[in-house]
Structures are given as structure tokens and as C-alpha cells.
Amino acid sequence: MWNMGLLFLIYYCVSIYSAKGDTKDGQVLPLDVGALAEDAGDAEANGEDTPERNSESSVLDTTLAFEPQASTQSTPIHGAVPTWRPKRDNCTPPAIEQFPQPLMNKWARQHGGLILHILVAVFTFFGLAIVCDEYFVASLDRLCEELKLSPDVAGATFMAAGSSAPELATVVIGVFFAKDDIGISGVIGSAVFNIMFVISVCALCSGTVCQLNWWPLVRDCFFYCVSILVMLIIIFNDVISCFESVVMLLCYVGYCVALHFNTELERWALGLNLPFKLPSKEEQSALVTYKNVPEGSYTQESVGQTQGQKATDDSETRSAKPQSDYQDYSDPNPTWDPNAAWGDESQPNPVANPPPVDDWGMGHSGQENMGYHADQPESVVTGDGPPAAVKSGGQVVSTQATSAGGNDYYKSTDKQREPRRDPLLRPMEGGLPALVSWYVVYPIHFLCKKTMPDCRQEQYRNWYPFTFLMSMVWISFYSYFMVWMITVIGSTLAIPDTVMGLTFVAAGVSVPDALSSIAVIKEGFGDMAVSNAIGSNVFDILVCLGLPWFIQTAIIKPGSHVNVISKGLAYSTLSLFSTVVFLILSTHLNGWKLDKRLGIILMVWYLFFITLASLYELNVFGYMNPPECPSTY
């Protein structure tokens, strides 16, 4: 320990001497003070090529794992700021050393022990999905109701945090524990996973063709592009400051404000002369948000044949209007009964119409809206915003309007038509696969049930603050073990952390979003599934990255900055623009419908993007990611 302290003192003195020698050029380079010991790669990057520095570099390379206490002394060098993590040009500090030492050494892991780490990582994926879906989202649902937030703001803040909690926890662990790029790469990979893989699986799993509305898709993609641009500008110089993290958070505040005025923006957009097929009023209703038909019966000819065959005079009048007349479509229509549109007559309405026939000549009878229940009128929300949140298991929080005279704040939908089945009870149906899956997730359900009250149940509805806190603890627990196991796997297989983040971590943290979108697409909610997948990406980039960076640079170590080690992440972020353009272009060329053909196209593009991004991180196209430094773990 005494020898290491002496080496650091020698290194510090040489650094000051070298920096003073550079003043003859009229420029003083910043010196990183008070963080970790830096090696010869930093000296070369700063132009410090003195003989004394070169003689010390070979000795200092042996102290890469040395982590001294942060110095409180100031330095006379102008512009010096403490860094959170040293950047090295010769090698990347091993992230595995930031975690407890594994029980198995590297030789044991390479000869079969790695399978245990893989199983633990998969188990953490299940844990994150169950905790987020069953408890965390439910507590946020009740929290939004108690705060009486507007539906759009609730959906863009708390409910978005529900499905994106694993991404946020992963970035926090990557910044404060692993101290590497696994959090950033996980967010980038999760963004591609949501916008390509999840939507592709939704299209492949759906047995119907869902006609998509262009406005929610274009709106979400626009803000998604803005968030990508902000992220690209911020990480392009490989450092993140406090000001830049604040900019990211303010951008998300602007996104919430835009969602609050979604009605005005939508009216303005629909008043434009755009070459898109506008949906009917039923399609824009809070309850009828999609059009779906059996996949084999969708043809362009059938569209033309059924345009003039409307079930009511009102729909005939709408079909004859020009596009510019649709700008007032969202005004309340008291003569249209949403219950009648679904074939539900359990609620009386003085002006009830028969179930309308859609553009494909098919009625809506027998189809269930997941955000509305006839026996629970209080669960319906008003507001003209996009879907606030989607929860797997047949539960959706809709944030669109039913009438102008209703409540304009968020309402919980935690009451269900059918009682929930106790997950601790052994399944009687499904055979061996259901029994095996029950045994696998039984420990997760058991621990959650014993430590957190289910605030969806009537007797625990007021316990949502405790459920919220405990679910955050469990999410942090599973996320920590997930990042730990992924780091061990990558270190054992000599795979960079950024590649593991783009692939395995991205898939693991996106499980809640994937389950939500797949659940609603099976019910025919194409717009809702796509909006859930794209909208969560805005939260992932602006909040899941901006908030941990702000805490680190403004609260924990004011004046410091966070370093981005891999240069390939900037190229991966730039490539995210291609995913947005490809999604909109392919959807438009496919007639704004979600079918199996679009699903296959998106799946191929996802595999291509992940392969290209991984090759960047593996230095196939140039020196982007320094190799990992030797480690004794």
C-alpha cells in the first residue's frame, strides 16, 4: 500500500511538471484530479510526451486497479475538473473488478461454470418482468390517480417509468457501480429492441391485420428523433457534464408539455394536406382505437368496395368529406355511443346506435376494449392524449377521451372483471410446460408476495406508497445481479461490455415493454402496441440516461463529468436514426397496416442493426473500443 501511494505521488508531481511545460504553447490542458490513477494513455492524449512521463508509464500500468481517495486539494492548473472514471487509450478498466469477486475463478467459468451465471441472468430477467408488471406499475397506477395528474402527463412520467424501470436501474448501476458503458449501450440496444424487435413480434403474433393511425406513430417518432439527436450531441465528445444532463431532462419536460397539448397538435396535423388515409371517428375514439380484420381478407379492392357501404348515415357523411374537414373530428359527438360500438348495452344511453360496421364490413361485436369495462365506468379516463401505459395480462390504461364533460384526470384501472389467480397455486392446466414455468418463477412470486402488498386488491389499495418503495428495492436488486452476471459473462468470453449491453442487457430490460405490447396486440390494439414501444424509448434516452448523469455530476460529485469510453457508441446512436426512418418508410409502403410481412421486414432489420453495432464495438471497422485490461477476477 505504501509503494502504491509513493507511485501515485510521483505520478502527480510528474503530471504537474508536464502541464507546466505545455504553457509555452499558450494553452493549458485540463488535468483530471481527485479520481482514479491514470496511465500513459492519458498523457499521450494530452500531449504529455516528456521522457520522465514515458519512464513512469511502464510502472503505473501495474496500478490500474488502484483507486485512491478523492483529493480535496485544488490544483493551480486552469480548467482542471475531477473525472468519474479515467479514459485509457491502451486498455479499458475491467468492469468486473467493480463488483464482488465471483465465487468461481476464470478457469472454472471457462470450463462449465459459466452456465450458472447465464441461468442467474435469465432468472433476473423474469424477476424484473414480474416485479415491474405486477407491483411497480400497479403502484404507479394508484399514485397517478391520487395525484390527479392529467392522463397524458401521467402516461409520459410515472407510467412510462413503470415499464422503463429496468433500463433506469441498469444505467444507475452502470454509472455508480460498474462505471462503464454497459448502461448506455443497454439503453441504445433497448431502443432498437423496442422499435424493431417488439413491433416485429407484435406483427408476427397477431392473427389479424391492424390498421395503424399515422398521427401517433409520426408524433412519437418525431420526439424519438429529437431525443436521439440530443443524445448524439452530448456523447459525441465522450464526456457528459452537469449542464448536458440538465438539457436532457428539460427535453423530456418539453415532451410532457407537448403530450398535454396533444389535442391541439393533432387537429393542426390533421388539417394539413397529407397523402395519408385518415381514420374514421370510431377509430379515434377512446374505445375503438384500432381496425383489424382476418389477415387473408385484407385487400385494397375490399377497401374501395366497402367505402360506400356504411351502416349508418353518419358514417356515410364522414366518408364523403374531404381531408381538410377532418380537423374537427375530435370534437365530442353526443350521438355516438361507445358502448354500442362494442356491442355492450349494459350502460343505458338515451341515444344508443347499433354497433357500427367498420371499413372492412365487419362489426365490433365481441371485441373487448382493454382500457374500459362496462361494469366499472370509473375506470375510464378522459383526455385526448396517447395511450398512457399498457400492462400485460390484459390490463391497459387508456388516456384518450370518451366525452368532453367527464373527469380530466387520471383514473386507475386496477379493478378487473375477473378475479386474479393466485400465482402461488399450482397450475391445473397447461401440462408439463406450465408446471415447469411455475416452478421457475415460484421463488419470485413468493418473495414478492411476502414483502409487498398487492395494491390492486381492494384491501391493499392504500398501501401503494409501500408497494412503490419495495418494488424499487426489488428492481434495484434484480438489476444489480443482472448487470453483474452479464459483466462476468462478457469478461469470461472476452466480449466487450458494450456488446453485452446492446444484446443481452437490452433484451432483458425490455421484457416488460415486450410483454405489454404483445398482450395488447393480441386484442387488436395496433396503435397502442406501437405507441407503447416507441414512447418508452423517449423516456429511456432522456430520463434513464439524463437522471443518473445529473445525480453524479451535480449531487454526488459537483463539477465532475462522466466519461464515455467506447467511441463506437456515437456511431450506434447515429444509426438509431436509420431505425426510425426505416420504420416509418416500411410502414407507409406497407399501407399503414401491421401484418406478418412488416414483422419479417422489421426482424431482419433488427438483426442487421445489432450485427453492425456489435462489429463496431469489436473494432472490425476501426479502433473504437480499447481492449479490456488484465484482471485477476
Curated annotation (Swiss-Prot):
Listed GO MF terms: calcium channel activity; calcium, potassium:sodium antiporter activity; symporter activity
Alpha- repeats: 153-193, 506-537
Transmembrane segments: 112-132, 158-178, 182-202, 221-241, 242-262, 428-448, 469-489, 501-521, 536-556, 569-589, 598-618
Record topological domains on the Extracellular side: 22-111, 179-181, 263-427, 490-500, 557-568, 619-633
Chain intervals with Polar residues compositional bias: 298-310, 320-333, 395-405
Keywords: Antiport, Calcium, Calcium transport, Ion transport, Membrane, Potassium, Potassium transport, Repeat, Signal, Sodium, Sodium transport, Symport, Transmembrane, Transmembrane helix, Transport
Topological domain ranges for the Cytoplasmic compartment: 133-157, 203-220, 449-468, 522-535, 590-597
Compositional bias per record (Basic and acidic residues), positions renumbered to this chain: 411-422
Keyword Membrane assigned: yes
Gene3D superfamilies (UniProt xref): NCX, central ion-binding region
The keyword Transport appears for this protein: yes
Pfam family for this entry, one: Na_Ca_ex
Primary residence: membrane
GO cellular component terms, A-Z: membrane; plasma membrane
Family: Belongs to the Ca(2+):cation antiporter (CaCA) (TC 2.A.19) family. SLC24A subfamily.
Known role: May function in the removal and maintenance of calcium homeostasis. Transports one Ca(2+) and 1 K(+) in exchange for 4 Na(+).
Protein name: Probable sodium/potassium/calcium exchanger CG1090
